Each structure stands twice: as structure tokens, then as C-alpha cells.
Amino acid sequence: MSDVLSQYKGCSVRDLPTPNFVINEEKFDKNCTTMLNNVEKLSQECGVPIKFRAHVKTHKTAKGTLKQLGHGLPLAKRTTRAILVSTLKEAEELLNYQDRQCSDYIDDITYSLPCCVPEFIPLLSNLSRRVNNFQVFVDNIEHLENLKNFGRPASGKKWSVFIKVDMGTKRAGLAFDSPEFLSLLKKLTSSEIKEVIEPYGFYAHAGHSYSSTSINDTQNLLMEEVKAVNSAAKVLCSVDPQFDPSKLTLSVGATPTSNSLKLDNKSTLVKFITTQLVSTLEIHCGNYCMYDLQQVATGCVQDHELSGFVLGTVLSSYPSRGELLSNTGVMCLTREASSIKGFGICADLEHVLKSESFSREWYVARVSQEHGILRPIRNWNETTPLKLGSKIAVLPQHACITMGQFPYYFVVNSEGIVNDVWLPFQKW
């Protein structure tokens, strides 16, 4: 990436090739700072330690991860050393980067896919040697059997496991009040399993919070997450009365539910944490550093808070049908959607770089492989025309998926000047 940076450093965003992905570093920094400070404020209001674990899956970069951890953010009131990864490659490459920098800003990694099967356990074992704290997900009795049969990981410690709690999305995990969950905990507390495995805590993710339409809705869902993991911990204590629940970490969050921490009135949450929570609370989330239209649709953030966009070019015009052609097709925008229509909202480059509201006039209505068809949000005759050859910023529906389509990201300041290029640790 040094060649790309040397070629484009100092250039204006208007001079960059398209399509490409651009990150506004000042907005990225502000988003990271805000989330860290919201968690810190909750901790102070409750008078108890509350952890934060940054999910790095959206951008998958070393420099972006450092910011999520609180480094280089002068206004951040806390830092963290704990991350969540969606692939083993993310973890390995971040640790490789850390080794090259002779630093240890990460010392706690959780792998978020329940994959304790023979194919992956040796890989998980090797990774356990490289970090002080490493957790894996389990949601199946066979996962426990597989770990037991493998034996302790290469770290020499016991396997540290998060039990995944299903919040009703039926993606992964078990409902805390299900017979399967009870059976899993009975197996977890059996003497043969205890020799090689220990519970780290319970993990819940309200994926359905992405369908929320107000921040008050997401606050209610955050309460549901907290209550679910707390109930899960109580089930464990009922199975093993000798177990001390204060040793557990109860990890909850999604970007929409975590964003509800910005609300001034958190009295119900604070009261529950201070009077009923049996273990240490941890907040986790990842998309917040970037944001996207799916997050805007939840009512928790504004479009000018998005820190990234796809840079495209207007290629042709079809006034008779009221459409334009751009090079922002499915290969760079994907087919993700939300309650906001289309596959992306177009914005003027001057406006999208500022931290203030801007008007929406065009959106990406249809996509094929390399073709993006733009339509006006209102009437063609009432919309500011876009000249052929002009550059546009397209706000993506889902940043995590969209960013996966690009080999690197141009990082610009609020004036649109390139100051860095970030390389993502993509694929597997």
C-alpha cells in the first residue's frame, strides 16, 4: 500500500480513481471517541467497572482498530485492549502488525463464530498462544466434547468459552430458557469438561435491533440483552451452586443497542446493573466507527455521521427516463438494503465531508455488475442535475459488506485531502 499512498497522498478526493472507498478520519475518530465515552459514562453512573470490546469486522484494519481501542483519540476518556474478530485472519494479522510495532495494545481476543469442530480447533489453539486472553464461542454440547477430546490449547491454559445466547434472531446461540441451554450448562459443569474448559461468560447480540426505528426502541432491546445474559448466568449458578458468578463477563451489544447509551435517561438500566446484575457487564459493537444507512434507518444516528462512502463517477444521462448512470454497481455497493430505499444515497463531496446535515437528491435505484442506475428522490425537473464526469459520494446501506469489496481505503481529512491508505485484512 506504500505505492498507493505515495501516489495519492496530498491529493484531493476529487482526483482519486473510481470506484473506491473513502474514510473521513475525523468522523471515524469522533465515532470511536463517542462510543468509548458513552461506555465510560455508564460505568461512572453505575459506580462499577463496565468493559468495552471493539468488534473490528467492519473495516478490518490495524490503524482503525487502534482508534477503536482509544489510541490517538485525545478526547477519549478510556481505552480498551479487548477486541472481537469475525475471522481468524483478522486476529492473526492484527497480532502480526502488533509484533512489527513492538507493542501490545491488544491482549484480549474473542472469536465470534461458534466453530469448535475438528477443522478449526488446532487453529484456535495456535492463536491462544499469542494473546493473554482468548475466548471461543460455544452453543452446542458437541463443541464441548470436541474441545475436551483435543485437550488444553497451546497456551497451556483451559479453553475459555463464551456461551452464545440467542436473542430470538435464530442465527447462532441458544435461548437461555431452552432445554438445550440447560443441557449445555450441565455438560459444561461436569468434572470431565472442567479439566480443560472454563466459562468466561455469556454473550448476546440483538441483531433484530437493526430493524428498530427509534433510539428508545434500541434502549429497550439493550435491556433485553442485559436481562438475557444475567438470566443465563443465574441458570449456570442453579446448575452449579458452587460457581461464583462474579467471575463471569456478561457481554451485550449491537451498534443500535449500544448507541442508546447516548441517552441521558438510563435510570432503568443503571438500576438493573447496580441492583440485579450478578456479573461484570461488557458492551460490544463494531459498525459504530463507520455507520451506514442501515444505522440511519434505526433512528440512532444521522446521515452526516457516516464516516465512509463509495466514491463514484457519473457516466451517462437519460432524461427521457429520468435516470443517470454511474460506475457504482453491485460489485462495490452489494445488494444490501434497509427501510431507506435503494442501494445507496448520493451526496455532494463538499457536503458529505462536513459534520452537518445535507440534502438527499439522488439515490442508487438499481445495480448490475458495474452499472449503478441513479434516480432522483423527488421529481427530475426539481433535482439539481449531475454533470457527466462529476464525482459523487454514495453512502452505503451496509458498511461492513460494502468495504469488503475494496482492497484498500483512502483516508481523508475534512477538506477531502488524502493523508493515509488503510489496508484491510480481508477474506479468511
From Swiss-Prot:
Q: Name one GO molecular function term.
A: D-serine ammonia-lyase activity
Q: What EC class does the entry list?
A: lyase
Record's keyword terms, sorted: Detoxification, Lyase, Metal-binding, Pyridoxal phosphate, Zinc
EC number(s) per entry: 4.3.1.18
Give the sites modified to N6-(pyridoxal phosphate)lysine: 57
Chain sites annotated for binding Zn(2+):
398, 400
Example GO BP: D-serine catabolic process
What does the record give as the function of this protein? Catalyzes the conversion of D-serine to pyruvate and ammonia. May play a role in D-serine detoxification.
Q: How does it assemble?
A: Homodimer.
Can you name this protein?
A: D-serine dehydratase
* Lineage of origin: Eukaryota, Fungi, Dikarya, Ascomycota, Saccharomycotina
Its encoding gene is what? DSD1
